[in-house]
Structures are given as C-alpha cells and as structure tokens.
Amino acid sequence: MAEIINRNKALAVSPLKASQTMGAALAILGLALSMPLFHGSQGCTAFAKVFFVRHFREPVPLQTTAMDQVSSVMGADENVVEALKTICERQNPSVIGLLTTGLSETQGCDLHTALHEFRTQYEEYKDVPIVPVNTPDFSGCFESGFAAAVKAIVETLVPERRDQVGKRPRQVNVLCSANLTPGDLEYIAESIESFGLRPLLIPDLSGSLDGHLDENRFNALTTGGLSVAELATAGQSVATLVVGQSLAGAADALAERTGVPDRRFGMLYGLDAVDAWLMALAEISGNPVPDRYKRQRAQLQDAMLDTHFMLSSARTAIAADPDLLLGFDALLRSMGAHTVAAVVPARAAALVDSPLPSVRVGDLEDLEHAARAGQAQLVIGNSHALASARRLGVPLLRAGFPQYDLLGGFQRCWSGYRGSSQVLFDLANLLVEHHQGIQPYHSIYAQKPATEQPQWRH
C-alpha cells in the first residue's frame, strides 16, 4: 500500500497538472459533431485551445461563454443561455458539452439552473443534447476531468433500461481513459474486431483526433468520433470493458443504467496486462486468440530478454496522471526496474493500492528533488518535464499530455504487445545513449609514455 504525500507548498513550481476542464473537453471531442463550451472567460478557452492545437496539431473546436468583470460578479447565466443559443443556431451540433472553469465555479454558477433557463426560452432546440459537467480548475487534474465528463456523457446520453442486455450479442462497450492515445484506441478496436466483436469506444478519439485530412475544407464541429445514436445502443451490448482505473465512477454509472456486466483493466502495458485483455476477449467472443497475437507475444518476450540488461535495477522517475503512472510502474516493475520518484498532479483512489512505497501529489519541482535524491537515471513525463530532466542530466521519455515538442507523439500506440515492446526498446536506448560510466583510475605512480608527460612551463 502506497503512502500518499499531499502537497505542502503554497505555490506550484513548474506545474505538472493540466486542468479538469481540458480533460472534460477532450472527452467531448471524442463524440461526433460535438462542441465543448467553456463557461468562463475568453482566456480560459484560448489557453486550452493552444494546448490542444500544439499537442494534436489539428484544428480543435472550442467555444466560450465569455464571462467578463460584470458577469463574474452579477451572475453569468445569461452568458450560458446566449452561448448555447448561438451554437445551436449557427453550428447545429449533435451534442454540446457545457463545462465549468475555475472562474465560473468560484463565482458560484449553477449549470443545471442555466440549462433549465435555456430549455425554457428556446424550446426549438429541445432535441439538442447538452452534457453539463462541473470541472473546477482548482481541484482534480486532466484525467479526473475526463473521467467526470465520461460519467456525465453516460448519465445524459445512455437510456436507463436494463432489459436490453445482449440484444446486440457481438457489440462490446469500451470506456477509454484520458491517457489512451488515438493509436492506443485503434489497437483496442482492432483487437476487439479480431475476435469477431464490434467495439463501441466511449469516447472515440481515434476517429476525431487521429490526425487525418478531412474531405471538407472547414468544419466548425468535430469530424469523426462516436455518434449520439451509437452511444444510445450501449445498453444492448454483451459486455463493457473499462480501460483505466480512473473510470470506475463512469463504469458504475453505465452498469447501473444498463445492467451490462463489465470487466476492468489498468493500462494495457506489459505481458500480464495484455494477456488478461486478450483472454477476456476470448471468453466474451468464444473464439480462440488469433495466431498473430501469439507471435507478437513471443516478440515482446524477446524484447524483454534483450532489454533486461539495461532496465533491470534501473532507477526511474515518473511524473504523470495516476492511470499513466500506474501503467508505467507496472511495466518497469516487470523488468526489475525501480520507480524512485512518483509524482501525480492530484490524488486518486487507485494510488493507495499500488505497490509503490510512496506517491507525492505535487509538481515537477517535487519530481526533480525526489529524482535527485533517488539518483534517477531516467524521467518519464510530458514535454513540460524536459527542463527538469536536463537539470538532472538524465534522458526524458515523453508520455502523457501535452507533447508539444515531439511530432506524432499524440498518436503513438503504447498498448498491446507491440506497443510494450517499443516502450522497452525506447527506454533501453535512452539509458544506453546517456550511459554515465565511471572514470578509470590512474595511479599517480604509473609510468606514462613521453607524449603524455605534463608540459612544464618555465
């Protein structure tokens, strides 16, 4: 059982955390023809948009209620009503995500009251689904905001019927963690399809933010993703697969509304995790594991053999959201490596049961201090951790959100046998490249060739 060390500073130095609002927006972006609406100032939305565009290198649709000094004091329900009306009128979305920010939460807004006013004033837009999510910046993190949005999506868009289970016997729901990249989601979908099943990814970023050129020159809404109509059939699936411990609340909500049984997994990193994933698919489908996965498993075993010389007893420092940290720690632990510094931006229930001796809730300065004390040889974190890694004199494996200085990082596949093999190779290569050897000892009495004698000056 890990000891959770809470933040004890009055400020954040080199912040690790990305806000809950951004995480919730990412979940909404996984729905087809959707529009996330930030209830806050224009700067809140502009800041998040910069993060998303630099990470995905794609146009990202976001809107704002544009709170100002007056509405921040006197109330901003009118801003919400007007913003919803404008989006429905001009862009005709299939779904809108209404997300709070630190400003609106501090002001004391009531999303449900504002939403009721909108429904009352504009009955012509009663068929437009709106998902309200409370996501204050001053608590939680990117991952928890994403999880809160997924839970709200389930509670808002999935019908509450428990008599439809198995009506679509080949359909499987998949609740996807914030830390799964579009590449990870493609692997998950392909692995499910290889067993003759149909995946329903909730939400589906593999179709909306996978980095593709759309046929339309401009679209104000998301292109691709999970449609509202498809999401409504989640109660007819035969099973639900939950990837990521952070989605426990969303999984409970989906099971309660639909009665569909679920199976829960961590991140699909490493031999044991992928074995459990494929065996679950084999049990659900009744089909054997395809031969190609047996081959990929043997390749991962060979990769583990090749890299254990470098990774065994390696000292690593990890700064990431809880799901990602636990996934990497399990993979490294399977190779005999040690996590000497573990830092997360916010607490999570799953951290308590982890085998780590301690996990610190903090920032990248905390990571830097713990990594230096533990003599870490490698850092795993997002692009913000680069400066800390350079000061420590160790390499950085970029993972998580955001990755603004690495092209293609947003769509890399980390999951499965092949994804795990590549992670092991990358970690081993970084350690080999930055190997810090011990300078050989030369006795002061050793006789050296004349060419190596010191040049005396007179």
From Swiss-Prot:
Gene Ontology MF terms in the entry: metal ion binding; nitrogenase activity
Provide an example Pfam family for this protein: Oxidored_nitro
Q: In which pathway does it act?
A: Cofactor biosynthesis; Fe-Mo cofactor biosynthesis
What are the recorded Gene Ontology BP terms? molybdopterin cofactor biosynthetic process; nitrogen fixation; protein-containing complex assembly
**Which SUPFAM superfamilies does the UniProt entry name for this protein?**
Helical backbone' metal receptor
Q: Binding residues for [7Fe-Mo-9S-C-homocitryl] cluster, per the UniProt record?
A: 44
Question: Gene3D superfamilies, from UniProt?
Answer: 6.10.250.1090, Nitrogenase molybdenum iron protein domain (3.40.50.1980)
Q: Which UniProt keywords apply?
A: Metal-binding, Nitrogen fixation
| NCBIfam families attached to this UniProt entry | nifN (TIGR01285)
Per the record, the similarity remark reads: Belongs to the NifD/NifK/NifE/NifN family.
> According to its UniProt entry, what is the function of this protein?
This protein may play a role in the biosynthesis of the prosthetic group of nitrogenase (FeMo cofactor).
Concerning PANTHER family, the annotation shows: LIGHT-INDEPENDENT PROTOCHLOROPHYLLIDE REDUCTASE SUBUNIT B
Q: What is this protein called?
A: Nitrogenase iron-molybdenum cofactor biosynthesis protein NifN
